[in-house]
Amino acid sequence: MFEIHPVKKVSVVIPVYNEQESLPELIRRTTTACESLGKEYEILLIDDGSSDNSAHMLVEASQAENSHIVSILLNRNYGQHSAIMAGFSHVTGDLIITLDADLQNPPEEIPRLVAKADEGYDVVGTVRQNRQDSWFRKTASKMINRLIQRTTGKAMGDYGCMLRAYRRHIVDAMLHCHERSTFIPILANIFARRAIEIPVHHSEREFGESKYSFMRLINLMYDLVTCLTTTPLRMLSLLGSIIAIGGFSIAVLLVILRLTFGPQWAAEGVFMLFAVLFTFIGAQFIGMGLLGEYIGRIYTDVRARPRYFVQQVIRPSSKENE
């Protein structure tokens, strides 16, 4: 049997990108939620290359009296999951909770995640109830969740919700993975022995706009497909086999028709031949594009460049920067 250790210290990791309007309320509510735990805690805010005043506000929050805030400033924008991984590399708690800065998932849910983790779960996920997002966002999220469930076989309901809790050994395992394209909820479930999801409240976004545009969602789907599974490559092999068999069958059919109806039929079949040819060419280009995606990601990983570059770390115990 695996021994269940009680949670002694909680680390809350929050990526921040152009969220200066929501930061004061975010810090206040997250601090209040952590204070109610009766445990040691720290709040790590990672500025992901914001162009507004977010970074300056984080530094001030870390340097405030009796602060529990660690500010991590990245030199540019690397994306939500890379920013979270930067936070993971600086946590000191034995339970790590991730939270978005837009306050759509309320920080007041943190005690529930901690309580569930204390029951012995490695990963505590959440499912958003009554989502307050646009039709497009909800539809895209459903498609992504179904894609993940089919490719991984993990029947989790809401991979897009970043309000999650991870035991320290799960975070350490993720930090040992060096692929550039990382989707944290899936990666964590690969290493988790026991995982569970709980329902949480979902609010409308009060400040700013969502940072996930249409193209970023498309890129996310490409990342998920090429990072999670090689099934598309196997499907290409299957498609190639079907096309080859179909082409051979059509060739045999053309020979039979020519022998049956004479050479004059061949001229009348030119347009069909062109249609078949264009179908094969289109299938080849689709396959080449998919192979290019895989090869491009292999090339990116082989270069072994860091996921992010930390420009500055400000801890509450000292006003000196790391």
UniProtKB/Swiss-Prot annotation:
Say yes or no: keyword GTP-binding present: no
Entry EC no(s): 2.4.2.53
Q: Topology versus the membrane, per the UniProt entry?
A: Multi-pass membrane protein
Predominant location: membrane
Pathway the protein acts in: Glycolipid biosynthesis; 4-amino-4-deoxy-alpha-L-arabinose undecaprenyl phosphate biosynthesis; 4-amino-4-deoxy-alpha-L-arabinose undecaprenyl phosphate from UDP-4-deoxy-4-formamido-beta-L-arabinose and undecaprenyl phosphate: step 1/2; Bacterial outer membrane biogenesis; lipopolysaccharide biosynthesis
Which InterPro entries does the entry mention?
ArnC_tfrase, Glyco_trans_2-like, Glycosyltransferase_2, Nucleotide-diphossugar_trans
Q: Select a single GO molecular function from the record's annotations and give it.
A: phosphotransferase activity, for other substituted phosphate groups
User: Which is a GO BP term held by this UniProt record?
Assistant: response to antibiotic
Family per record = Belongs to the glycosyltransferase 2 family.
What is this protein's name?
Undecaprenyl-phosphate 4-deoxy-4-formamido-L-arabinose transferase
**Organism for this UniProt entry:** Escherichia coli O139:H28 (strain E24377A / ETEC)
